[in-house]
Amino acid sequence: MKIFGRLDLILLLAGATAAGFLINSLHAATQDEQANEHAVEQAVLAPITAMFDAMAKRDAAAIKKPLLPGGGMVLMRDGKPIQMTFDAFADLVGKPGKAKTEERIHDPLVRIDNDLAVVWAPFEFLVDGKVDHCGTDLFNLVRADGKWLIASVADTGRKDCSGK
């Protein structure tokens, strides 16, 4: 019993080949989109990394560079908000000192809409290589003249960083 004729078989193979090309094209497009999305997320994270690097160097001028002038911070400490301008923060953190400090974020959640971005990430703040406090950082960023700047920062800071 003949299920497929030659023409049916040729059409079936042609359809399968076309479907394969379509799937490969869609896969390549998806990979390109993912690569572009990753590049955009890295561009959003770059000013945060620059600020952390400048904080570790205690360089007030460099701390201010990736910050939107006039912006500010809200640091939650013991259930109370501490507000300060970016200038006050940079002057405080940019003071010379003997202790080696470093802030690290991990698993950042990045959301972008045109020229506005939000980054939510757990963090650890280390002093001389040991965790001093931890919590969650929240960064609001804006893109001005093609450059991402931190517009505001909020964080929770707590000492109970068990397992860190």
Residue ranges and their predicted role:
Residues 20-65, 69, 164:
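Short, low-complexity N-terminal intrinsically disordered segments enriched in polar/charged residues
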Residues 10-24:
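Bacterial N-terminal signal peptides
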Residues 67-69, 77-79, 121-125, 137, ...:
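A mature extracytoplasmic/lumenal domain signature
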Residues 2-12:
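Bacterial N-terminal signal peptides that target proteins for export
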Residues 134-159:
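Short beta-strand edge/turn micro-motifs at domain boundaries
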Residues 84-132:
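Surface-exposed, charged secondary-structure patches
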